[in-house]
Each structure stands twice: as structure tokens, then as C-alpha cells.
Amino acid sequence: MTILKKDPRDLAKATGSGSAVIHFKEIRGEVDQRAAYLYFLPKLSSYDSYVQITILREEFNQGAIPLPSDNVQTYIKLGTSAWSANAGNVKCDWDENSGRAAGTFELINSQTEEKISSGNFDVTFPVKK
């Protein structure tokens, strides 16, 4: 079978709409005395593409935090492209006793102003003291 490929820049613009959902196969993270560090990976143990969200402790249990925020950092990497969200929101509820973080995120692409990723999480991970 011959594989045919064309550069998307050479194709005509079509009309319509579309959307995609990134399904995360793995969530990695930890919480220390400063922040929660969350990595959402579409492939197990692969850092070719991921969504990273870092939330400082002062934003825990504060409801949805609008982006940009000095207390919430985001980084989205899809293949060779990478950027930070400049709009959207992140919410993280934290239970110190159980080491459980639950929340939601909606991240907007700073280059196109379009929603790139949104989702929710409910994870338990080690607490570094």
C-alpha cells in the first residue's frame, strides 16, 4: 500500500466544525509544601505530549482560578509544539489528610485563543512534607 501525504498548508480551507478530546492514559504528580504538580499524559510514561498544571497551595480550595494567574502555571506540549494557556481556569480542591486532589481545568491556547484542553481529575498521590 502506498501512503499518500500532503502538507496541510497546501490543502484548501474547508467549511464546517470539528473538535477533539485528549484521553489521558496516565496522571503523574505530587504535592509538596509549595504546590501541586500534575502531568496528564495521553500515552503511558511518554512525555512527547502532555498537559502540565502547577497550582500553588494558596489556590487550593478557592474555586475556579481564572488564567492567567501568578499562582497557576500551565504548559501544553503536543509533539514539537508547546505553549502556555493564557485564558481559561483551573480548580483544585485538596484534602491534606488523604493526599487527594480533585478539580477541573479549561485551558485556552494562547496562540489561537481556542480551547485546547479541558477536563477533570480526582487523584491521590504522595504528599512531600
Residue ranges and their predicted role:
Residues M1-K129:
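An extracellular/secretory-lumen and virion-surface interaction module
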